Amino acid sequence: MCRVTGFRRVLFRSQLIETALLAQVNHQSLIATKTRRIVSAAEGRAVSDFGARRAHNMDAAVYGARAAYIGGAVGTATVLAGQMFDIPVSGTMAHSWVMYYKDEFEAFKHYAENYPDGTVLLVDTYDVIGSGIPNAIRVAKEVLEPMGKRLKGIRIDSGDLAYLSKKIRKMLDDVGLEDCKIVVSNSLDEYTITSILQQGGKIDSFGVGERLITAKSDPVFGAVYKISAVEENGTFAPRIKISENVEKITNPGLKDVYRIYDEAGHSVADLITKAGEKVDMSVPYRYADPVKPWKNRSFENCTAKKLQQQVVKEGKRIVEPESLEDIRAYVEKQLNTEVWEEEQRFENPHEHYLDMSPAYYEMKMDMLHESRTR
């Protein structure tokens, strides 16, 4: 949750930033989330962002690459993103390189001579098994090995990736190229990657494009920006938006948000309280479930961590920005140590609980009841 405070005399300034703030937060949160799902499906294999040409525009490509790196991608093929954010840049040859030459072997040979330390050959321009792999092997043996170099990898961008990767792995291993990596691309996402690996695909890394950079399966991240309180005579009076849809009813007033952890350090819920309200976890802490208010529940043997941190004061940044590497490491730590595996399922994930302190819940219910008389 992000809180933006603007006093009545400058309220319009808070309103002016709404679109820009939501555009940045929604887009990059969406791409980082999608990337994390893809990275999880890859089960430790490298995932790279190959999506620039299918992004909605260049800003989406560049900032999408940044978000993908935060989400766990090891690099991007978008060179500008690499320059702007110091993200590792990776990529392979294009089909146009192969097609420019009359002979596939000549195309591979010239590429290897130009990039001997990182030769990854695209083998599906004509016939993966019939010509692509044989020519790649020939380049490895006749061009690279005499230079003291090894063929770094091959890439396939079409066909049955599970079947082809198994055939290719055997062909490479049979000629002593066990260290040659197999890179695959072609409309990949977490579901296709899971399926390929379940079928025994022999793949070392994935280049993921359109379905990552557009989050094709679920292309909207629905964060909203709503007024929750208005300054009146030096204090903030809560405001609530009522809706025909219960999920669109806003949470009123100034508030604090705490993350609640069990003894093992797992996050069990987030807790909304009134701003400044004391949260004492030394004794069982009763809370209100806004979805199932009839349930009488409490947190026991838990700890609470306040999530909000003031970043801007009187228009000035008061906290140094975190590096991209620090942000990426924070995401990795959160997902590996604090978030339950059940909450990270691709299908029907367990929902992370969002609860309320009794005082906050009572305030919200009072405002809902009062709204009936208006």
Where are these regions (language model features)?
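A generic, residue-level signal for flexible/boundary positions that often mark functional hotspots
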Residues: 5-6, 182
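Buried, small/hydrophobic-residue-enriched core segments of structured protein domains
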Residues: 7-178, 188-192, 198-199, 233, ...
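Gly/Ser/Thr/Ala-enriched C-terminal appendages of enzymes
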Residues: 175, 188-374
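Short hydrophobic alpha-helical runs that function as membrane-insertion/retention elements
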Residues: 91, 183, 204-207
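Residue-level "edge-of-site" marker
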Residues: 95, 185, 209
